[in-house]
């Protein structure tokens, strides 16, 4: 009996060819079309700020890049000229006042490795705004390669993996304006290396992931605790690495950002005009309100379907149990700490669950003696 995909990673059967073609087509599509949200100008501003210190020059270069490179349909929204809302008035004020614009940059500078990735792509000759699409698309290609490799290692169905590439959750990462795709690439690569390459490589990638998104330090700590408990990492080494993981977001927030209280207040309560002089206020009552809103958003998303797949994969694919458990714990902890539910924040959970489901599909097919 022959199954697709076969176990050998270099044996390009029909499913592998389809997967490769689909990856290339989607990669080109994601290079051409990015969401370009209102965060675009702040990320571009942070790249400019690596080379220029004058707030006026930073504002001018950032908005010039947006108006000349971004699709015409999204430019009015980024500038705040399309609506009469409070949020739009803030965007207009940022555009008009370079010093006010500069006050918003620290909210986005706390993803330093992502900013450096944009800068590297820009130095290669790509426009400032287009660099965002390139980093997201390249991250997609990396994730697609890891998914294919992992599914093969598990003896899973590459046909099912083809479906994964077409999901809205994958598109959100591949077309997103921000570090989410790159963040999941580091986390997924680290997780895969822990089990199927070398733990040292996996730990290195996980440590680096915190410089893409600081909250990834939570996942790194969970992985280090697992390795220490399994005897794969000496206790003293685990303690040192956990300390580094914990100190990383502290160091990032010390040199950039306004702190957690300001972030919570900015996200869940206010749209402040001048965050540099804004006094944040966030109470327990505010947190509970945000938590209830986050739960409602989660219940109206695809999360429930993925949780069912997560439970199924946990039961049917023994080799994926610890990766699934670590991703589940990480996602739960992240939601409790920061209950702003957006699918892009939980990309790792979605992808690892889907990889487990690809293996579960093949295991059920094999148990019923069906050739795929």
Per-region residue spans from a language model:
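Perimembrane helix-loop-helix junctions
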Residues: 3-5, 191, 195, 218-245
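Interfacial juxtamembrane loops and adjacent helix segments
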Residues: 53-107
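Loop-to-helix entry region of an early transmembrane alpha helix in multi-pass inner-membrane enzymes
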Residues: 100-112, 116, 124-142
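Specific aromatic-rich, kink-prone transmembrane helix
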Residues: 146, 182-202, 352-356
